[in-house]
């Protein structure tokens, strides 16, 4: 990495932390975790890879603040006035960072960008499905399709499902705009792979939430981490298979 690229990464990290402080998107521990994750992705990957993570974080913050008081009154809002902690940061950014670490350790064979993008797409899809879909009371179990309480783990609603599709598609388009040269497919091909992986990972998150989180085997953040890891694996596999 040239000095100019390192300088860009440092400036982006500074901007990221500044925006998070002003918007209260992350608390103190969350800021430290985001700085560590961002450094790994920016310095071992590329500044454009880091920009995708920043795009997700800003989008997630907007979705969290959307109708926040109403969600808070109903008991569906994030705690700490919407500020997310280090567990949230690691749950959504840990898998992308690990993917970049492994990609760098293996000599950068070329799958890093797609693995990162698919993983972040899962986080984006799940965040929008949760923050927007929770306002839709037409909730059914993703496993049994029975009616379940709004906000229940494993619950899905028409609005939530649509939000998950839109979220993964928006992230895929952003990834293409920022990282097109890092993909081996055409623009449409990359968008399809990333958006499908993001949406599928969101469904994996819901299934794990209903089957394992509800039974106490996993926590919310563990489920998020496994789902984003699934996305990274889909991206890795697609590089060699598709």
Residue ranges and their predicted role:
Residues 1-129, 133-242:
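Hydrophobic alpha-helical transmembrane segments
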């Amino acid at each position: 990495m040239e000095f100019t690229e390192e300088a860009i990464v440092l400036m982006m990290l500074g901007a990221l932390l500044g925006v998070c402080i002003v918007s209260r998107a992350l608390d103190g521990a969350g800021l430290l975790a985001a700085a560590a994750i961002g450094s790994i992705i920016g310095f071992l990957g590329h500044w454009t890879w880091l920009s995708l993570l920043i795009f997700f974080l800003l989008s997630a913050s907007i979705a969290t603040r959307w109708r926040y008081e109403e969600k808070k009154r109903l008991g569906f809002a994030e705690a700490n006035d919407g500020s997310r902690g280090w567990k949230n940061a690691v749950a959504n950014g840990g898998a992308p960072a690990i993917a970049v670490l492994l990609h760098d350790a293996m000599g950068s064979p070329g799958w890093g960008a797609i693995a990162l993008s698919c993983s972040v797409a899962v986080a984006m899809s799940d965040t929008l499905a949760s923050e927007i879909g929770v306002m839709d009371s037409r909730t059914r179990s993703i496993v049994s399709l029975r009616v379940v309480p709004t906000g229940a783990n494993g619950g899905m609603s028409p609005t939530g499902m649509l939000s998950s599709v839109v979220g993964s598609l928006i992230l895929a388009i952003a990834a293409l705009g920022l990282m097109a040269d890092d993909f081996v497919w055409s623009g449409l091909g990359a968008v399809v792979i990333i958006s499908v992986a993001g949406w599928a990972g969101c469904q994996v998150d819901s299934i794990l939430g209903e089957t394992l989180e509800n039974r106490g085997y996993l926590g919310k953040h563990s489920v998020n981490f496994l789902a984003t890891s699934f996305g990274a694996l889909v991206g890795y596999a697609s590089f060699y298979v598709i």
